[in-house]
Each structure stands twice: as C-alpha cells, then as structure tokens.
Amino acid sequence: MGSIADADALARRIYARSIAGARNVNWVGGDPTPHIDTILKTMRALADLEQETEADARFLNVPMVFNSNTYYSTEAAKLLDGVIDVYLSDFKYGNDRCAKRYSHVDKYMETVTRNLVASQHRLMIRHLVMPGHAQCCTGPTVAWVRETMRDVKFNLMFQYTPYNVTDYPEINRFVSDAERREATNIAKGLNLI
C-alpha cells in the first residue's frame, strides 16, 4: 500500500544517498498528479536544508528524474516544469483505441504527445512493445517520435509481462521473437534506433 511521505525526511534521505554516491533522484510513478505536492515540498526541503545547515551544496543539487506514464494534465506539467531535470516517459500506445481498451483512458494521443513535446529537451522516451501491437502501436509511436522529436533518446522495450489481462486474451502472452524483430525493424527503418 505505501505510506505517507514526509518531505523533510525525504530531503535528508536524498542528501544522505547523494553523499553515498547516488547520481539522481528517480521519481517513479505512473500518474504523477497525486505525488506532485510531495515532490515540490521535498525540493523545497532540500533548498531549506542547504540554507539551515552546513550541508554541502554539491550533494543537494541532485538531478531529478521523473519516471512516468506521460498521461497527466497541463496543470501537472506546469507544476513540474523547472523542477524535473529529465523526463523518463512512457509512450505505450500508438492510438486512442488501444489506450482506451487496455488502460481505460481518453484522449491518450493528445495528452501524451502534448506532454512529450513540452518536455522534449530533457527527455528519454520508452516504448513497451505489446504482443500483436507492432502495426497499431509501435509503428505509429515510432513514426510520431521520428517526425516530431528528431534528437530525442528512444528506447524500445520488450519486457512486456502479462498481468491480470485474462479479459484480453490477445495480450495474455509474452512478445514473440518474431514480434521483437518486427518492432525492431520498424524502429530501424525510421532510423530511430
């Protein structure tokens, strides 16, 4: 389930981990909206820690990485702007139909592409290849990234694991070797990998 995060305690932990050699803070979350308040308070606590103590500033200025499903509001994006150094963003579906069917979200393409464009200078995009979705999802995703974001870092991922998808037998399996090759060929064909 998790626990309520204390921003001051998190800031002290980030500082301690940085001294021990941590090179970034990775905010992992799917949808960031419920966590934005904690992220912002933690960043403020880090700044306060520097002013209130003799903490070494080198260890307080740790790059902030936001690891997200990229499906969030414009308000959330504005709050995170200037706080997050690198966006590690998932671009899972290449169309609204698949996003609605499997993730039950509306306006997926509009939302995700808007957020990708907004964070494009500090961005790495990940695309999880799903079984049977090379043409409907991988192809359009790769094409959009290639057309819109020429210099972005792009990662094609094959570790899809079926979980709680018995209602969707078409994706209730691992990605086959043939599907891996097909997705790789799509990305290579557009010079994205």
Pin down the residues of each PLM region.
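Catalytic cores of large soluble enzymes that bind and process phosphate-bearing ligands
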Residues: 2, 133, 175
